[in-house]
């Protein structure tokens, strides 16, 4: 049995098998459009920040100065 899915970008049907070079996308174009959306942050994985300042203090967390610039 062959599985058919919808391309996440354009919704065209895509056959899901070894011959599908761009799965789950229908083409390289749709694949690159999706990559561009991730790179421009149109897509993002939601993050829930459960770590409170108090917990960070208890763990001895100190903010790294590596990326800070001198003012």
From Swiss-Prot:
Binds 1 zinc ion. Its cofactor is Zn(2+). Gene3D superfamilies: Erythroid Transcription Factor GATA-1, subunit A. It comes from the Bacteria. Keywords: Metal-binding, Zinc. Zn(2+) binds at residues 7, 10, 26, 30. GO terms for biological process: regulation of DNA-templated transcription. GO terms for molecular function: DNA topoisomerase type II (double strand cut, ATP-hydrolyzing) inhibitor activity; zinc ion binding. InterPro entries: DNA_gyrase_inhibitor_YacG, Znf_NHR/GATA. HAMAP family: DNA_gyrase_inhibitor_YacG. Inhibits all the catalytic activities of DNA gyrase by preventing its interaction with DNA. Acts by binding directly to the C-terminal domain of GyrB, which probably disrupts DNA binding by the gyrase. Interacts with GyrB. Belongs to the DNA gyrase inhibitor YacG family. This is DNA gyrase inhibitor YacG. The gene is yacG.
